[in-house]
Structures are given as C-alpha cells and as structure tokens.
Amino acid sequence: MITGASSGFGAACAEKFASHGYDVIITARREDRLTKLKKSLESKYGIKVLSLCFDVQQMDAVNKAIGSIPDAWKKISVLVNNAGLALGRDSFDKASMQDWETMLNTNVHGLLYVSKAVLPLLMAQKKGHIINMGSVAGKEVYEKGNVYCASKFAVDALSKAMRIDLLPHHIKVTSINPGAAETEFSLVRFKGSEDQAAAAYDGYTPLTAEDIANTVYYCASLPEHVCINDLTITCLEQAGTYYFNKE
C-alpha cells in the first residue's frame, strides 16, 4: 500500500513493486491520476491494483477508506507512507501559517492516521513492514526550512518510536531520508513557479523518483530477519542539506 501514489516517489514505488509482481493499493487525492496509474500498471504487469481516493489530512476519510478495503486485500505486506509536501521557502517571521498547518497535517498527522488505520491488519498477520518517507531535512535544519524541517524531524522520531513499540509484533519500520530529488516536489513548494522549481536543481544531477523507488524496494525485499531502520540517500553532489558541488 502506497500513499501519495499519484506522482513522484509514490507513483515510482507503485511501478517498482508492480514490476516485481506485487498487487498494489494506491492512494492519493487526485482520482484521475490514480485511475490512469491503475490502468497502466494492470496493463503492463498483469497485476491487480486497488485505488483509494482520500486526503491523508482527514482522519475520518482515512479510516473510512482503510475500513472499506475488501477482505481479499487485507493481507498488506508493506505500507509506504509517502504522502507529503513542502510549501513555501520563507523565513519564520514571514511564512504562512496556512502552509505550516498543511505541512504538519499531511507530513505528520497523515502518516499517523494511515499507520494507525493499517496497523491492526499488520498485527493480525504478526508481520509487515512500514516504510516512512523522511528527508535529509529531518536530520539537519536549513535556512527557511523551519516547519517543513520540523515535520520531517517528527517523521524521524516517529519512525524510531514505531520501531521500538512494534518490535513485539514482528513489524519492521524503516525511515528513508532522501536529499534533493527532481519530482513535482519543488513545483508544489514554489506554488507552480516553474522557474523557481527548475533553479532548485541547477548545476548538479539530483536523485530521481526511480532512485527512491529502487531504495524502497530494496529495503522491503531483504530477508525477513533483516530490517534497515534508517537510510539517508543523496545524489553524488550533495552532502547533508547545505553542501552541494555545483558546476
């Protein structure tokens, strides 16, 4: 099951798992994109896709969608908590409170709502794997990152807490922390400004959505007794959040 599957990391993860024969549950807010992805994956790989359209920010909608999953789909082996976003790149004093609320509601509350709703299915199986999409911004704060960084620090802490608390239930928890990756992320962050979004990747080759999907699949495909707890991945020309070797 993959949240935020309508684009970027989520769509690439759905493609990766489907290419290895997994049936996949894809979720997002944009139903048209989910429908298109479902048709593509089923046609290309001959697998089954269950599409659930909901906003992870809405707890009732999350619970209703997860509660509607047919019995045949309830044996979820991997949950990829991918839904997330950044909005704006402003200093603390100038940033939008509405942007802050949307980031916290999506990146933190959304992860909690989905995890809490899916967890009983994993516990009933006494196995499963929760993969949370963190960020290098959850490891090191950067200028004008403020609440986005805080939301990803929360993902980092929650991943560690979940790993400990779910240990008796044989459930793996992994936090994957990407650096700069060229998806719709910057376009969303800069609210549709293509120039600003493109400038974020000037002078170096960033990660791709496929790079992250490969990493997610690698973590999920290890032997049952192996769990990668925390993995940070950047492109060659990035170290941490600040340091880039740009041409």
Regions found by a protein language model. Name each.
Residues 22-36:
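Conserved glycine-rich Rossmann-like NAD(P)H-binding loop of the short-chain dehydrogenase/reductase
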Residues 6-7:
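Conserved glycine-rich cofactor-binding loop
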Residues 115, 151:
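Active-site helix of classical SDR
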Residues 135:
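Residue(s) in the substrate-gating loop at a strand-loop-helix junction
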Residues 175-176, 183, 195-241:
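C-terminal helical subdomain
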Residues 31-32, 53-65, 97:
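The beta1-alpha1 cofactor-binding region of Rossmann-like NAD(H)/NADP(H)-dependent oxidoreductases
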Residues 90-92, 96-101:
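Substrate-binding pocket helix/loop in short-chain dehydrogenase/reductase
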